[in-house]
């Protein structure tokens, strides 16, 4: 790490192991791509490029190996993890484009309605906003008839049980916790979830469901 440049007030955390660290990267990417507005990332973020702690790459003395693009890392022992993170981000971009009606409305306040919910599917109150387990529900009203979207976020260090909205058939489309164990897809099909079930969300994971269009 370059200890000579950058300011000292940094907020960082060593997650202790590489799988957890990559999981948190996927959480950050999914939060960014599912937010309103234009996702903006640094070049190389999609394949886990790092500056090894140097947060001041614009400093003239920072023109060194800490900040260069190390293209050879694609051929390193961790190259398969980098390739799969690249695939994850690419698929996130595709998923966002397919749901622009929710994540990127053309006019402010004109997008699909949504509500912040607790893990118990209740409306958020003042004390709930400081919690680490929440849901975002994009739902239909009199003006909308699109596939609904439910984003479950659990940043606790243990599994949390979420209550899904009633009367809706859900299918899982994203699981940040299991991606690297499941190959070059965002998630494997696991059937549909109906009848207001409970859904266990793993430690420090984001799970996204939507209402699939059934073609008869």
Feature locations, PLM:
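Alpha-amylase-like alpha-glycosidases and glucanotransferases acting on alpha-linked glucans and related
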Residues: 1-17
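Carbohydrate-interacting/catalytic domains
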Residues: 18-22, 26, 31-41, 45-47, ...
